[in-house]
Amino acid sequence: LYEDEDGIIWVGTDGGGLNRLEPKSNRFTHYPNTYGYKVASITRYNERELLMYFFSKGLYLFDKRTGNLRSFTLLNDRRNEEIIHSGISVNVDYFDTDKINLFADKIYTYDKSTGSFTIAHVADSSRYYGTVQRFYSDKDITYLFGRNYILRLDHAENAAVCLLAFGSKAVINAACRDDEGNFWIGTDKGLFHYDVNTQALNEIKTNMFRE
């Protein structure tokens, strides 16, 4: 799901392509030329276009007015093809003016103003593998979660460090950052709260769910 600056909600489906929901009118629009595509992630590209990743197909720019698609190459043709056929998804995030993070086998940043890519340094990267998902970002930092860890990406330094790792104790399914800057983490072992300042991790006892 992605909500654009006009309040339109873009709904990516697993094989049904892209859909548009206008909340004020409850009007729902399907784009037939995207049917059959598995939409893995969506973000802003500019006022007119969205950037999205279709699983095993690649990155595409989608024109919100015409519904037309055009391909977008990640880094270069060779690397782009390798990622498409790797079986991983690329998660995309427009985090600042003309800058987009692309989370794949590595953390890539695309600068639209220069048309260039950079790759973030991840401390002890051999321990933190697999696709990561963004759960908070602003112009300075992005927080990401992987299978059993949380990373903090510093945009100025173009480097990421691990803030928290569960190891084999739990698998992270979801995470969010609250208004106080702390994390709520949903895992296969229950709900946890992480205090960023004290680095205290506490399990939240609840009977709302088992996982």
Label each region the model flagged.
Residues 1-211:
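Carboxylate-rich, polar loop motifs that coordinate divalent cations or form catalytic acidic clusters
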